Amino acid sequence: MIKLLYPKFWQKRNIIAYILFPISWIYQFLGFLRHVFARPVILPAKVICVGNCSVGGTGKTQIVMYLANLLKTQNIDFVIVTKAYGSNLKEATIVKAEHSTLEVGDESVILAKHGTVIATKNIKQILPLIHELKPSIIIVDDFLQNPYFHKDITIVSVDRQRLFGNGFLIPAGPLREYPNRALSAADLVFLVGNNSGGIPVSLASYANKLIQAQIVASSDIDKNKNYFAFSGIGNPERFFLTLKNYGLNIVGYKIFPDHYNYLQEDLENLSLLAKTNNATLITTRKDYVKIGDSSDIIVCLDVKLSINNPNLLYEKIFKKD
């Protein structure tokens, strides 16, 4: 799997974006063909699909965690289906405690602490496992653009800072599909980020289905130390902002590509940077689960989702036919 950083031209158009724009037409046409010829499978449970219009972190994982915890409080049997990014997975697998991130993906390992998880790269492979587990609800993490299964409820996550980038499709921009289509079809739109500033103009027409959300720290971390931060996630800027809002003194940071698998050399270099700055290393839970034996010298920041309108979410999840 190709791992890329979020290039600057994805946020603000430049000559590179315009050069790549014709390739975006090909991407769009291939997506159109997928939808034309797809025959969606109807899964034997209510399906809640959480996804986004664009590449990069938009808070999907935190939304899935929130939904999982919500369903637990209602004693509803559910299963989480993940896309197994960064893994060498060949077939759909129920995630166990002994599975590594290389086997099932980092998000699968994290979400397995919140409920039963099926990791897969092909949504059609989950059918035998779903029949075995017999959940009432299936939470699908990603697969929003996948036309091969029926979705009962769709939730689109949007990052408040990046929104829809430069407005171009991959590879000229960050978009997997144009926002108007995804947002119009969505049952709920989560705007994830600092709630100050009101609703962006591009989302104003979706205010009746909009939930504003913030990702906040849920860890108890010593604020009297210096920290050197690092991450290999889709939106590292939000992680660094969360650290700042938590009141930590960040003396430096290093960004790795999304879903990055750390080498021993990387960890040694990070340790040297931290030592040089008289600091302690700090990272995200997604990175932490991939570090292995070095995790005892690194602080992990856990986060959770805080939303402004839980009643709207409850209404959609529990009252929709």
Swiss-Prot record:
Protein name, as recorded: Tetraacyldisaccharide 4'-kinase
Function: Transfers the gamma-phosphate of ATP to the 4'-position of a tetraacyldisaccharide 1-phosphate intermediate (termed DS-1-P) to form tetraacyldisaccharide 1,4'-bis-phosphate (lipid IVA).
Pathway assignment: Glycolipid biosynthesis; lipid IV(A) biosynthesis; lipid IV(A) from (3R)-3-hydroxytetradecanoyl-[acyl-carrier-protein] and UDP-N-acetyl-alpha-D-glucosamine: step 6/6
Any one GO cellular component localisation term in the record: plasma membrane
EC number: 2.7.1.130
Domain of life from the UniProt record: Bacteria
GO MF assignments: ATP binding; tetraacyldisaccharide 4'-kinase activity
Top-tier EC class: transferase
Recorded catalytic activity of this chain's protein: a lipid A disaccharide + ATP = a lipid IVA + ADP + H(+)
Any single biological process term in GO: lipopolysaccharide core region biosynthetic process
Keyword Kinase appears in the UniProt entry: yes
Family: Belongs to the LpxK family.
Entry keywords, A to Z: ATP-binding, Kinase, Lipid A biosynthesis, Lipid biosynthesis, Lipid metabolism, Nucleotide-binding, Transferase
Stored InterPro entries: LpxK, P-loop_NTPase
Chain residues that bind ATP: 54-61
The gene coding this protein: lpxK
